[in-house]
Each structure stands twice: as structure tokens, then as C-alpha cells.
Design a protein with these regions (language model features):
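Conserved ATP-driven helicase/translocase motor core recognized via long
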Residues: 53, 172-362
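Walker A/P-loop NTP-binding motif
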Residues: 33-49, 419-420
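Conserved helix-turn-beta segment of the N-terminal RecA-like "Helicase ATP-binding" lobe
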Residues: 64-96, 117
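Conserved Walker A/P-loop ATP-binding site and its immediately adjacent core
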Residues: 54-71, 103-107
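ATP-hydrolysis module of ASCE/P-loop NTPase motor domains
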Residues: 31, 51, 92-99, 117-187, ...
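Conserved helicase NTPase motor core
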Residues: 4-8, 13-14, 19-23, 50, ...
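Inter-Walker segment of RecA-like/P-loop motor cores
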Residues: 86-108, 360-370
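Walker A/P-loop
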Residues: 18-37
Length: 432
């Protein structure tokens, strides 16, 4: 029995020649829609596409394997109904070598085909987790021993202030955490430098001129817009025929609060924002008996309202716990330790990279960054697609990514540079 798609799903399946991001809740059939889109392109009666002209990426081998099986089953069924169809016969052959893969699998493909462009030994292997963990531990141990032996005053102060008791294990964990965070960025060393820059205050301008402070208000604006959208959604439900109309009073008061916060954000009034968020007070929903009201809609409104309230509470707990003066003092006090942490992290990254080169092994992060180095030419702040990127871009009719919400910036740039974006075509399809 054929699947009956909704109007929205049908649109997503059939739209062509544009970049598309499908955002929907878990369990809503996003992956099924992606598979159907692939099938619709392969079986298009007017302009069918060979499956090896599609780059299909997801985040686990299991998911990639399941997707390949789904496509193969559908092709098998179509071929059973039309056994003389040469195009379908060809797809059944191509399915086994089609690029239905994980992101790291695609990176490996790029490196295998273009390793000579970055001077990489083609005899490399991918290290397993256990081996990498032991290697990291050895490098960290050697790193800290060297710093202790040098007697660096800044390092000694850093350890005395931030180590837990007599153990420096927590500091080693901080180095690893910062290293991992940096490696999810296209240019890790630049990102680490930016972390330090955020804490280097100009005495005359103070914290308000830092990139971090300006970015903070962008985060606040986005969060408040989301809270406002949730509030409006809840009010719309209250206005339905079986909606809890008596909840509107509390929701309208919530909206007044959100708009008050938006005004403070527009003025970048940090201290008043602290005062408001640290003293949040929400009106109680009406407890009066409501005739003819859907219990399901009441629960839905309550849940949506709680989500909006959580956004406001989260802003207060994350970003607005002290005055601007105190924040400035904390930032200045944190600058020295952060510089040392970044220095340790950079040193660790270099030593870890050297050890992996010695053993001729790569980890998944290496593969992403080597693939990026192959696909992107960077000169100063200007990045342009390489010849390899242009070749791969011509190879793919469409680039499809499942579970887009799990991708990082490195992976997004990789996807962009093998897509039609390189030559002004729109052919990226993402679900998440």
C-alpha cells in the first residue's frame, strides 16, 4: 500500500533547484521523506538521476546502512513491476557503490582521492577510540611534566588556583574539553585566539566593546523572539473553540514581560536585565472551572507556556547573574588563567598531532580538517573553493544530509563546498 504524504511532505519531496532545510520533531517521518525524495529523483519520468550523482550523508553507519536498504528495497519493488526498465537495472548496480555514507566516510573518500594535495602519507589508518585515549593521556602527562619542570610562574599560579586539591586531573580534563571544542571549528587555532581576545579588555572601553558582549545580545534577541513565538502560539490555542480562554490573562502578562525584556535588550541595559531576570514572577493560570474546554488543549497551552518560561529562566541563570561592574572584574580576573589554558591547549594540540603523524594515524576530527584543507583555499580572511571542491561539486546533482541538527561548522562548510554553492546552483537538502 502506497504511503499517503501530507501536502507539506509532498512539497518537500518534489521541490527542485533550491536549498531546503526540513525542520520537524523526532518521529515525524523526516528520514522517510528524505528517502522518498531520493527515490523521486531516481525514478523521475522526465529527468531521472543516477543514484551515484547523489551525495547522501548521515551521522552513523547504522543509519547509512538502513537508508541504503530502504532505497534498494524500493528499487527492487519498482524493478519487479517494470523488469525491462534499463534505468532501474542500472540503479540496482550503482546502489552498491553509491555515496550513502557517514560524514567521516565522505571525508575519508575526499582524502583518499586528493591526499597528494596536502602531502599526506596515503598509508594512514584510522585510530580506534582506545588507542586515541591512551595517546591523549600520554601527551597530557608529558605536557604537564614539561611545564612543571620549566617552573613557569604563570603555569604554577594557574595550577594552584584551579586544580582540585592536590590533583591536576581536572585541569587536564579542561585542556581536553577546550581542545574538543576547538576542533569543531574550521580553524581551531584562530578560534582559541578568539577565546582569549574576548577576555582582553580595553581599559577605556571596558567589556561593552568586546565581541563577546555584542554576541551576548544577539543570543538574547534570538531567545526572546522564540519565547514570544511560543507565547503567541499558546494564545492562538486559547482562542480556538475548545481552547482554555481563561488562560489568556496570564499569557498576556507574560507577553508584557517578554516585551519589557526586548526593550532592555534593544538598549543593551545589562544591569536592568539582571534585575528583571533575577526577580522573575509569572502570573498564575486561571483555576476557574471551564466548560466545554478540551483537556488536551489545556495541557498543550501549559506545556508551551512552560517552554517559554524556561527560556527566560535560562537567560537569567546563564548570562545575567551579576552586575556589569562585577562581570567586568570577573572577566579581567579570568584573562590570565584563560591565556594559560589556551596556551596549554595549543601545545597539546600540536604534540598530539605530531604523535599521530609519527604513528601515521588519524582520528575523525583530523579527517574533517584534512578534507577541509583539500576543499578550501584560505588566504588571510578570504576562503575560496579549491579545484578539488569544484570537481566534486560537478559530480553531485544534489547533496543530502540527515540529522542536520547534529552537524558542526566544519561539517557544514564541507557540505557547502561540494554542493552547487560553488558554482551558484542550489542543490542542498537537509533534514533535522
Amino acid at each position: 500500500m502506497a504511503v499517503k504524504w501530507t501536502e507539506e511532505q509532498e512539497k518537500v519531496i518534489t521541490l527542485r533547484d533550491r536549498n531546503i532545510l526540513v525542520s520537524a520533531a523526532a518521529g515525524s517521518g523526516k528520514t522517510a521523506v528524505l528517502v522518498q525524495r531520493i527515490l523521486s529523483k531516481i525514478m523521475d519520468s522526465v529527468k531521472p538521476v543516477d543514484i551515484d550523482r547523489l551525495l547522501i550523508m548521515t551521522f552513523t553507519r547504522a543509519a547509512a546502512g538502513e537508508m541504503r536498504e530502504r532505497i534498494e528495497r524500493a528499487l527492487d519493488q519498482a524493478l519487479a513491476e517494470d523488469p525491462d526498465n534499463e534505468h532501474l537495472q542500472r540503479q540496482m548496480t550503482l546502489i552498491h557503490t553509491a555515496q550513502i555514507t557517514t560524514i567521516d566516510g565522505f571525508c575519508s573518500y575526499v582524502i583518499r582521492n586528493y591526499f597528494h594535495l596536502i602531502g599526506l602519507d596515503p598509508g594512514y589508518r584510522t585510530a580506534d577510540e582506545g588507542e586515541l585515549k591512551l595517546l591523549q593521556e600520554d601527551v597530557l602527562k608529558e605536557l604537564f611534566e614539561d611545564y612543571y619542570a620549566e617552573g613557569d610562574e604563570d603555569f604554577t599560579t594557574f595550577v594552584e588556583c584551579y586544580a582540585a586539591g592536590k590533583s591536576d586531573e581536572s585541569l587536564k580534563e579542561h585542556v581536553l574539553d577546550l581542545y574538543d571544542a576547538s576542533m569543531s571549528n574550521p580553524w581551531p587555532e584562530e578560534w582559541l585566539d578568539g577565546c582569549v581576545e574576548n577576555y582582553c579588555l580595553d581599559p577605556e572601553k571596558g567589556i561593552v566593546e568586546t565581541k563577546w558582549y555584542q554576541s551576548l545580545w544577539e543570543i538574547v534577541d534570538s531567545a526572546l523572539k522564540e519565547a514570544e513565538e511560543l507565547n503567541r502560539s499558546a494564545m492562538e490555542i486559547c482562542g480556538e473553540s475548545e481552547g482554555p480562554e481563561l488562560y489568556l490573562d496570564a499569557l498576556q502578562k507574560d507577553l508584557v514581560l517578554i516585551r519589557q525584556l526586548q526593550e532592555l535588550s534593544d538598549k543593551q541595559d545589562y544591569d536592568q536585565m539582571v534585575q528583571t531576570l533575577q526577580n522573575l514572577s509569572f502570573a498564575r493560570l486561571s483555576t476557574k472551572k471551564m466548560e466545554g474546554v478540551s483537556g488536551q488543549l489545556k495541557s498543550l497551552v501549559k506545556d508551551i507556556r512552560e517552554d517559554a518560561k524556561d527560556i527566560l529562566k535560562d537567560l537569567g541563570s546563564r548570562y545575567f547573574q551579576c552586575s556589569l561592574e562585577e562581570l567586568t572584574e570577573l572577566t579581567l580576573a579570568s584573562a590570565g588563567p584563560l591565556k594559560m589554558l589556551v596556551k596549554l591547549t595549543k601545545d597539546f594540540a600540536q604534540r598530539f598531532s605530531d604523535k599521530k603523524r609519527e604513528k601515521n594515524v588519524l582520528d575523525f576530527s583530523d579527517m574533517e580538517h584534512f578534507a577541509l584543507e583539500i576543499l578550501l583555499k584560505k588566504e588571510g580572511d578570504i576562503c575560496t573553493p579549491s579545484q578539488a571542491a569544484r570537481e566534486l561539486s560537478e559530480k553531485y546533482d544534489e547533496v543530502l544530509l540527515d540529522e542536520y541538527q547534529d552537524s558542526n561548522l566544519v561539517q557544514e562548510i564541507l557540505m557547502q563546498n561540494v554542493s552547487g554553492w560553488v558554482n551558484d546552483r542550489k542543490n542542498i537538502f537537509m533534514v533535522g
